[in-house]
C-alpha cells in the first residue's frame, strides 16, 4: 500500500472517532463509526494472507451488525421522541438495542467471541488499533449513555467480561489471544466503573491505553507470538525480558505497577458507593488474570530450558539485533516511565 494512502486512511480513522466524540446527533454518531470502520478495513488486510483476510472479514461483519443495531436503536428513539438528538434520555427498547451494539463494539461478554480470533489473525500493529483506538468512540458513547440511562444489561455484561477475561486466558499459549482476553477483562473494569464515577473511568481508560500500547509494541518489536518465544530467553537480552515481564504484570494489575491503579481506583469508587458484591466479583476475575500473568513470568524467568552453553551469550555478540534493540530501548523508555511515574499520581485522583 502506498504511503500516502496509508496516511489518508489513518487520518480518516482518527477523524471518525473525533466525529463520534464531538457529535450530539445519532445519525452523525453512526456516520462517524462507519467512517472509522470502513477506513480501517484496508489497513487490516495489509498483509493479505488468508488468516489476515479471515480476521478482517470477521471484524467487518461484527462492526456492520453493531452499526446496524445502533442505527436501528436511533431510528426507534427518533420515532418515540421525534428528534435525533443524543441529549434526550432513551426509551427502554432502543436503550437495550444500543447497549447490545456497544457491547459488540467493545467486545464485552457475551458479545466477545469475535475479538480473540480477530486479534490472533492480525499483526500486532493492526491489533493494537482495534484493542486501543477503536475502543475510544464506543467508550465515550457509553460514558455519556450511562449518565442518561443506567443500563443493567451493560453492567451485567461488564461483570461477566471480567470473569471471562480471567478464565479465558488460563489455557492460552498465543500472546495475541492472551492480550485479547486481557482487553475483554479490562473493558469490563472500565465499563463498571463508568456507571459510578466518570472521572475514575476516564483515568482508567488512559492507563489502559498506555499499558496496552506498550505491550503490543514490545511484543511486535521482539516478535513474540507464543509463550514458547518468551521461554527462549537466550535470544533476548535481560533488559528486554525484564521489560516484557514488568509490562505484562502491570497489565494484570500487580502492585505497585501502573495497572494496579486501574484496579485500585475502580474498587475504591465502587466500595465508596456500597457495591460490595460487584467489587468481590471483579476481584475474583482479576485474580484469575493475574494468575496466568504470574505463570508467564515464572516460566520465563525461573525455568531455563536445555540449550547449548554458547547460545546463552548469543545476544551479546549479535550485530543484527542492534536496530531491533534500538527500537526496544525506545519503547522501554516509554514503558518504564509509565510504570514508575503513574503510581505517584494517585493522590491527584483519589482523596484518601
From Swiss-Prot:
GO BP term, pick one: mitochondrial electron transport, NADH to ubiquinone
Main location: mitochondrion
Enzyme Commission no: 7.1.1.2
MF annotations from Gene Ontology: NADH dehydrogenase (ubiquinone) activity
Catalysed reactions, semicolon-separated: a ubiquinone + NADH + 5 H(+)(in) = a ubiquinol + NAD(+) + 4 H(+)(out)
Entry keyword NAD: yes
Cellular component annotations (GO), alphabetically ordered: mitochondrial inner membrane
Chain coiled-coil ranges: none
Name listed for the protein in its UniProt record: NADH-ubiquinone oxidoreductase chain 2
Source organism (scientific name): Paracentrotus lividus
Amino acid at each position: 500500500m502506498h504511503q500516502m494512502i496509508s496516511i489518508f486512511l489513518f487520518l480518516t480513522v482518527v477523524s471518525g472517532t473525533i466525529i463520534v466524540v464531538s457529535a450530539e446527533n445519532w445519525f452523525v454518531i453512526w456516520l462517524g463509526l462507519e467512517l472509522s470502520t470502513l477506513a480501517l478495513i484496508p489497513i487490516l488486510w495489509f498483509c493479505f494472507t488468508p488468516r489476515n483476510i479471515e480476521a478482517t472479514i470477521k471484524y467487518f461483519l461484527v462492526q456492520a451488525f453493531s452499526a446496524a443495531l445502533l442505527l436501528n436503536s436511533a431510528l426507534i428513539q427518533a420515532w418515540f421522541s421525534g428528534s435525533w438528538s443524543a441529549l434526550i434520555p432513551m426509551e427502554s427498547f432502543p436503550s437495550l438495542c444500543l447497549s447490545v451494539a456497544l457491547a459488540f463494539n467493545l467486545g464485552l461478554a457475551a458479545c466477545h467471541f469475535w475479538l480473540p480470533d480477530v486479534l490472533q489473525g492480525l499483526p500486532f500493529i493492526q491489533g493494537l488499533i482495534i484493542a486501543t483506538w477503536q475502543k475510544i468512540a464506543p467508550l465515550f458513547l457509553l460514558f455519556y449513555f450511562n449518565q442518561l440511562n443506567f443500563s443493567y444489561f451493560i453492567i451485567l455484561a461488564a461483570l461477566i467480561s471480567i470473569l471471562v477475561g480471567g478464565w479465558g486466558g488460563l489455557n492460552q499459549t498465543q500472546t495475541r489471544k492472551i492480550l485479547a482476553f486481557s482487553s475483554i477483562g479490562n473493558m469490563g473494569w472500565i465499563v463498571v466503573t463508568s456507571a459510578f464515577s466518570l472521572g475514575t473511568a476516564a483515568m482508567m481508560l488512559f492507563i489502559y491505553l498506555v499499558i496496552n500500547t506498550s505491550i503490543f509494541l514490545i511484543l511486535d518489536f521482539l516478535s513474540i507470538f507464543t509463550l514458547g518465544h518468551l521461554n527462549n530467553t537466550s535470544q533476548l537480552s535481560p533488559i528486554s525480558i525484564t521489560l516484557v515481564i514488568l509490562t505484562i504484570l502491570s497489565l494484570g494489575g500487580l502492585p505497585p505497577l501502573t495497572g494496579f491503579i486501574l484496579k485500585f481506583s475502580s474498587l475504591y469508587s465502587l466500595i465508596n458507593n456500597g457495591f460490595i458484591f460487584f467489587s468481590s466479583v471483579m476481584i475474583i476475575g482479576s485474580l484469575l488474570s493475574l494468575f496466568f500473568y504470574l505463570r508467564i513470568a515464572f516460566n520465563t524467568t525461573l525455568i531455563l530450558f536445555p540449550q547449548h552453553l554458547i547460545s546463552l551469550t548469543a545476544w551479546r555478540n549479535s550485530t543484527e539485533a542492534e536496530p531491533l534493540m534500538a527500537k526496544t530501548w525506545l519503547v522501554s523508555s516509554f514503558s518504564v516511565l509509565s510504570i514508575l511515574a503513574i503510581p505517584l499520581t494517585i493522590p491527584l485522583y483519589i482523596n484518601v
